Amino acid sequence: MAAPELKGTRVTVVGLAKSGVAAARLCAREGARVTVTDRRGEAALGGALAALPASVTRRLGGHDAADFTGADLVVASPGVPLANPEIQAARRRGVPVWGEVELAARFLGGLPIVGITGTNGKSTTTALTGALLARHRRTFVGGNLGTPLSELVLSGEPAAAAVVELSSFQLEGIERFRARVAAVLNVTPDHLDRYPDVDAYAAAKARLFATQEPDDVAVANARDPRALAMAGASRGDLHTFGFGAPVPASARDEGGEPGPGGTAIWYTPRGRAPERYQLHNRALRGRHNRENAMAAVLCARLMGVPGEAVQAGLDAFPGLHHRLELVAEGRGVEWVNDSKATNVDSTFVGLAAFPAGAPRVVLIMGGRGKKAPYAPLRPLFGGRVKALLTIGEDAPAIERELGDLAPTEPCGDLPGAVRRAAVLSGPGDVVLLSPACASYDQFASYEERGEAFRRLATEQAR
């Protein structure tokens, strides 16, 4: 795929989040006459504006239709729906509309790319796959995970491969972007404020496979019918992973949990003996993370990473911040930060990562609720939850729906909950922050909430 000739062309970049800024910088570097436009005003965009070259024209607080219909190219940030009236007007005029990923990919030539999508688990699987590949070759890791793909082009740094997390929003804007290995982890209803139904949401994700060639590889969760169907439409070779997934060329696990004793992942190459990879790493605890690890092992081996490098990468993977992250340990108590669990489904997965039996989890929940019931968590409380500590705006609802299942105390805020957790926990226990709520009632973001928990837990663990 030849790099586009942008010198002297009129490019409009819509949306000034990280990917929009990176796209604008790349187009300006290539000599385009760049206009950026965002409905937000200057006060809300200070940091983004400061990162733009002086040559870039800024259109803030709204859009001018002429910037779209008069452009040679429109680059839309992932947060901008392609149903936007100005974007539709540009398309009617024959103006190409790309996403930032599409723009960047056109400058990357034949760089082998692993593209990973799915409703849940994308970030962990992308980071783990990147860590495994990095033990074999110089690898860029980014996309929706944090660093826009355009930053790789701008950096000029050599890379032998890229592992890119791709959201449905990003995949809407691809035309020729091609993943050497394309993986879909799962598909469940999400972003239905942007898509009319789950079929439209799945169709956006399926675009990842539509651009593959016969010598590419499609990877799918064998137990997810939507994922399997979309990957099966690829012109590439289909490989599967999952619990009890069939051979040939599959990855599956043998049960158990990471930690002492551990579990293992089996990879079965076509025509060769199965390979066994030990999974001891507590950063990958939980059934969902075992599934993520299966996908990562499969992608890495299909990209030619040697088996010994895969095992070393699994052992060393530190996990991602705020996702079942062990942040402190002391007096025999583990303190686990799952602040990224901003909805009930995520807390369900987090709590299920701990074995049932004698109740050992002191659970901190609460924040700004999302008008979803907490009752789906009830089956997990028995044999797991030693005490429930509530914080934030939705504490009364949590107490009402779950408070009969374990000793429950309203604590008001996170510092109060952590102090109380230190009193209630003992050797062998886990203090788990898994809020099932957004953070905005008391924190600016789930990251800020997680960092606050890290500091407070570290103090208590001393």
From Swiss-Prot:
**Cellular component, GO, one term:** cytoplasm
A biological process (GO) of this protein is: regulation of cell shape
Alphabetized GO MF terms: ATP binding; UDP-N-acetylmuramoylalanine-D-glutamate ligase activity
Which branch of life, at top level? Answer: Bacteria
Q: In which pathway does it act?
A: Cell wall biogenesis; peptidoglycan biosynthesis
Q: Which UniProt keywords apply?
A: ATP-binding, Cell cycle, Cell division, Cell shape, Cell wall biogenesis/degradation, Cytoplasm, Ligase, Nucleotide-binding, Peptidoglycan synthesis
The residues listed in the UniProt record as binding ATP, with positions renumbered to this chain, are 118-124
Q: Which Pfam families match?
A: Mur_ligase_C (PF02875), Mur_ligase_M (PF08245), MurD-like_N (PF21799)
Q: Has the keyword ATP-binding been applied to this entry?
A: yes
Which E.C. number(s) belong to this protein?
6.3.2.9
The subcellular location is:
Cytoplasm
Q: What reactions does this protein catalyze?
A: UDP-N-acetyl-alpha-D-muramoyl-L-alanine + D-glutamate + ATP = UDP-N-acetyl-alpha-D-muramoyl-L-alanyl-D-glutamate + ADP + phosphate + H(+)
Classification via HAMAP family? MurD
Q: What does this protein do?
A: Cell wall formation. Catalyzes the addition of glutamate to the nucleotide precursor UDP-N-acetylmuramoyl-L-alanine (UMA).
What family classification does the UniProt entry report for this protein? Belongs to the MurCDEF family.
Q: Which PANTHER family match?
A: UDP-N-ACETYLMURAMOYLALANINE--D-GLUTAMATE LIGASE
Q: What is this protein called?
A: UDP-N-acetylmuramoylalanine--D-glutamate ligase
Species for this entry: Anaeromyxobacter dehalogenans (strain 2CP-C)
From the broadest rank down, the organism's phylogenetic lineage runs: Bacteria, Pseudomonadati, Myxococcota, Myxococcia, Myxococcales
